[in-house]
């Protein structure tokens, strides 16, 4: 009788211990769950989200709220189903070259027979609407059999370098050429004036009740994370980063070439793309470079301008892992 009593006691203790252990320490549950990839990515995303939220809280406390990330604002896709590729273009981020690349890959033979150039001005480009879509769902549908496996490519560049290029081109060069358009909110090349107005517009666009229509300036200056449906698809993208220094552009180009090579694009086509891209580089180098240098100097010398830039682009730096030394200075 005593023997049975002792055995029962031991069993009960064992059972309650293990139950207690299971319910209080759920670390084993976590381990199991992370083995499914979607959960794993979800966790990474939650970490990133927590990090972004924390940065936003800090910024708010100092009275300088950041523009929120991942607003679904602008999308431009061009596809090359033959190579299972879709390219998302971000304005002022080699977008002309990238639409040229998508066009060559879409129908290489026709492109070559017509003696077209990869760097044709956007409005005259050869493929036009033939391979271009505005929503990822449509891109998926057009990819046919590859709708689960196609590669999403995007080229991004340092947000400040992109802003300088945008501002010197659209707010100085074009604004002077077409004064009637009052482009860039009629700021006459004043960077601070532009950023104050643009910041307010981005705040409005990121509210759920936004009534304003996206302007030409909004689309060119929008944070990187507002493009390409990154809120949903960031982890699926092959991200090609351009170096800040145009002299290092060749590296960015080499990355692009590698990604295309992985997609079985033939050598001759790769060489054609590379040659055109480098020619375009020298073409651009001389074009509005004076304004470019002036804007760059202004940003370097004016902390207030850097603060505005930080409010708009800081989370881009974090999300896409760019060097924050300058923007924090
Ligand atoms: C192709 O275009 C280039 C310049 O754009 C021109 O020099 C060349 O003669 C053209 N070739 C043909 C075959 O049309
Ligand atoms: C594109 O994807 C389809 C379906 O997944 C596959 O059969 C085909 O081989 C792929 N083509 C290339 C060039 O990778
Ligand atoms: C530029 O704009 C800012 C803000 O609108 C203004 O305070 C400043 O005086 C302007 N600078 C010049 C040189 O006009
Ligand atoms: C393409 O170039 C690579 C090296 O750059 C070479 O190994 C490969 O054989 C070439 N392919 C063809 C089809 O010429």
Swiss-Prot record:
One of its GO terms (molecular function) is chondroitin 4-sulfotransferase activity. Coiled coil: none annotated. The chain crosses the membrane at residues 4-23. One of its GO terms (biological process) is chondroitin sulfate proteoglycan biosynthetic process. Residues 24-329 are lumenal. Highly expressed in the head and tail of hermaphrodites, in particular in amphid and phasmid sheath cells. Signal peptide: none annotated. It comes from the Eukaryota. One of its GO terms (cellular component) is Golgi membrane. Disruption phenotype: The tm576 deletion mutant is lethal. The ok625 deletion mutant has reduced levels of 4-O-sulfated disaccharides, but increased levels of 6-O-sulfated disaccharides. Increased mortality in response to oxidative stress. The keyword Protease does not apply. Its EC number is 2.8.2.5. It is a single-pass type II membrane protein. It catalyses: chondroitin beta-D-glucuronate + n 3'-phosphoadenylyl sulfate = chondroitin 4'-sulfate + n adenosine 3',5'-bisphosphate + n H(+). Residues 1-3 are cytoplasmic. Keywords: Carbohydrate metabolism, Golgi apparatus, Membrane, Signal-anchor, Transferase, Transmembrane, Transmembrane helix. 3'-phosphoadenylyl sulfate binds at residues 91-97, 157-165. It is found in: Golgi apparatus membrane. Catalyzes the transfer of sulfate to position 4 of non-reducing N-acetylgalactosamine (GalNAc) residue of chondroitin. Belongs to the sulfotransferase 2 family. This is Carbohydrate sulfotransferase chst-1. It comes from Caenorhabditis elegans. The gene is chst-1.
């Amino acid at each position: 009788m005593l023997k049975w009593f002792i055995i029962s006691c031991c069993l009960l203790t064992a059972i309650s211990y293990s139950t207690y252990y299971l319910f209080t320490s759920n670390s084993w549950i976590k381990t199991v769950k992370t083995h499914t990839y979607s959960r794993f990515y979800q966790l990474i995303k939650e970490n990133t989200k927590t990090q972004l939220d924390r940065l936003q809280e800090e910024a708010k406390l100092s009275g300088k709220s950041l523009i929120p990330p991942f607003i679904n604002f602008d999308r431009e896709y061009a596809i090359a189903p033959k190579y299972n590729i879709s390219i998302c273009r971000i304005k002022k981020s080699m977008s002309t070259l990238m639409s040229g690349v998508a066009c060559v890959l879409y129908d290489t033979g026709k492109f070559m027979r017509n003696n077209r150039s990869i760097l044709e001005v956007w409005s005259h480009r050869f493929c036009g609407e033939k391979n271009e879509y505005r929503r990822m769902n449509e891109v998926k549908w057009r990819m046919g059999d590859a709708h689960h496996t196609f590669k999403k490519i995007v080229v991004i560049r340092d947000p400040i370098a992109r802003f300088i290029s945008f501002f010197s081109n659209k707010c100085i060069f074009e604004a002077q050429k077409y004064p009637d358009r009052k482009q860039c909110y009629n700021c006459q090349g004043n960077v601070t004036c532009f950023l104050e107005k643009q910041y307010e517009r981005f705040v409005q666009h990121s509210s759920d009740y936004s009534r304003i229509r996206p302007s030409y300036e909004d689309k060119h200056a929008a944070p990187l994370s507002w493009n390409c449906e990154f809120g949903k698809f960031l982890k699926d993208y092959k991200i090609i980063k351009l170096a800040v220094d145009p002299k290092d552009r060749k590296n960015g180009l080499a990355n692009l070439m590698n990604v295309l090579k992985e997609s079985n694009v033939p050598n001759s086509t790769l060489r054609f793309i590379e040659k055109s891209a480098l020619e375009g580089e020298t073409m651009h180098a001389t074009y509005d470079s004076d304004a470019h240098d002036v804007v760059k100097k202004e940003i370097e010398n004016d902390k207030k301008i850097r603060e505005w830039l930080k409010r708009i682009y800081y989370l881009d730096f974090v999300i896409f892992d760019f060097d924050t030394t300058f923007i924090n200075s």
